[in-house]
A protein has these predicted regions:
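Extracellular/periplasmic carbohydrate-active domains that bind, remodel
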Residues: 2-453
Length: 453
């Protein structure tokens, strides 16, 4: 009887241990909930006028295709502007539609129980030109499919709601990718180009065909209080990808997708170098989630440069990497002034921290071997993890070593002892790091030079 009780208690402990570890990871983040916020960059404005999609013939029965209704509604907002802007309200129901554009000074509001579903008829998706900083579609040469919801050259746009859902119904696109039958690059779920004052909050995004939220060439973008979901085997379903954009705030959100939770980008090889628009002033705060790839990533498409990034109070679990900075010869550009602070991680299958100079593919054979990127001034502090296969891999480029890689109070433990840091072509310092870091990192900040915390 005693043996049976012991076995039962042991089994219960095995079940509860992962939950207890997860609670331990999240507790410090809950305590930080009253910390700073950057949502003031693009607040959710209250509109003076409210109209409903039903006024334009919309039918939320899950069968009627409402593309024309949404396009008529947006046309009305654009061409009969009201002082203070207009809210387009989508009531409870299932609203099937093709892709559509938004306009300036509008709010798209999804009520509780509203589900906006993308059509699975790929013939209904228009093609658009490739991004100039990519030179081609990200997956295929030439044009790309238009994003499900998009805007170009806009100001003051809000997508929000009362936990309404935008469902990209991406399975048809994922299967085309798996079968290698894609003719063009898959559509993003939400994309804004050349826009400012973009606010996305309080809704659920799920099953995106490709990247979920893609602000590109934008300024003053806020993504807050979001839930972004896709199966872990869904290809390239990144959560939020700020791309050649400045003043971006991503806060208080849960993301579980098939690729990086957040990936900061700025163009691809020679096209990104020529376009020359960096990403800068990016804040990622109180984001939780899991991914088969990276929790928080920078790159690998960073040819326009990335700088002034703050990642703090985040929790990453069941992922491939925790923090992942990735670039490659041919990318050019720079990644600098990156601060990562107070990050918790568990169940990391590859490495807790990876900074790599050999990551990512190329758009074509025309990239230059002389376009060598620089990585400088990366500060990683107060990071703690359990179940981390390898604590870290810091591998720079022989002709351009990564400099001022500074670690402080970083403790990443595996399920078994013996895992070690791996370093090459990197310079910096480490204090209070466990397991002990590699010899390439000095044991004092003074010796490393300019490692200031």
């Amino acid at each position: 009887m005693a043996t049976s009780s012991f076995r039962g208690g042991l089994a219960m402990a095995v079940v509860l241990l992962p939950l207890l570890l997860l609670l331990a990871l999240l507790a410090p983040l809950q305590c930080a909930a009253a910390a700073a916020t950057c949502v003031g960059l693009a607040p959710a404005k209250r509109r003076r006028e409210v109209i409903s999609i039903t006024e334009f013939g919309g039918v939320g029965d899950g069968r009627t295709v409402n593309t024309w209704a949404f396009r008529k509604a947006v046309y009305r907002i654009e061409h009969q502007r009201r002082r203070g802007g207009t809210e387009l309200r989508v009531p409870a129901g299932t609203w099937l539609t093709g892709s559509f554009n938004l306009t300036s000074h509008m709010t798209l509001f999804l009520a509780r129980g509203a589900v906006l579903k993308a059509t699975t008829d790929t013939r209904r998706w228009p093609l658009v030109e490739p991004l100039p900083s990519y030179g081609r579609g990200r997956e295929m040469p030439g044009a790309r499919y238009a994003s499900f919801i998009s805007g170009n050259g806009l100001r003051d746009v809000v997508i929000t709601g009362d936990k309404g859902v935008i469902d990209g119904q991406g399975e048809v696109w994922w299967n085309m990718w798996r079968r290698r039958t894609l003719q063009h690059t898959r559509p993003n779920l939400v994309e804004f180009m050349h826009s400012t004052g973009i606010h996305i909050s309080n809704i659920v995004l799920k099953n995106s065909p490709f990247w979920n939220i893609h602000p590109v060439y934008c300024n003053n973008v806020v993504v807050t209080n979001m839930m972004i979901l896709a199966p872990h085997d869904s290809p390239n379903t990144d959560g939020v990808d700020p791309d050649s954009s400045t003043n971006v705030c991503i806060e208080d959100s849960y993301i579980s997708t098939g690729d990086d939770l957040v990936a900061i980008k700025s163009g691809w090889d020679e096209y990104g170098i020529a376009y020359g628009r960096p990403s800068s002033a990016i804040t990622i705060r109180r984001v939780r989630g899991s991914s088969p790839f990276s929790g928080i990533a920078i790159g690998s498409e960073a040819s326009g440069g990335v700088s002034d990034v703050l990642v703090e109070d985040c929790s990453i679990f069941n992922s491939g990497y925790g923090i992942h900075i990735k670039t490659n010869v041919g990318r050019g550009g720079y990644i600098k002034n990156v601060t990562v602070d107070n990050v918790r991680m568990s169940g990391v299958r590859v490495a807790g921290v990876r900074i790599a100079g050999d990551a990512g593919d190329h758009p074509d054979a025309h990239f230059s071997q002389l376009a060598v990127p620089t990585v400088d001034a990366v500060r990683i502090t107060n990071v703690w993890g359990v179940g981390v296969q390898q604590p870290g891999s810091l591998e720079g480029i022989r002709s351009s070593p990564f400099t001022r890689i500074c670690l402080s109070n970083v403790k990443l433990f595996g399920w078994r002892n013996g895992a070690a840091w791996r370093c090459r072509d990197v310079r910096g310092a480490a204090l209070g790091v466990r397991p002990s870091p590699c010899a390439e990192l000095a044991t004092s900040f003074a010796a490393a030079g300019s490692c200031s915390f």
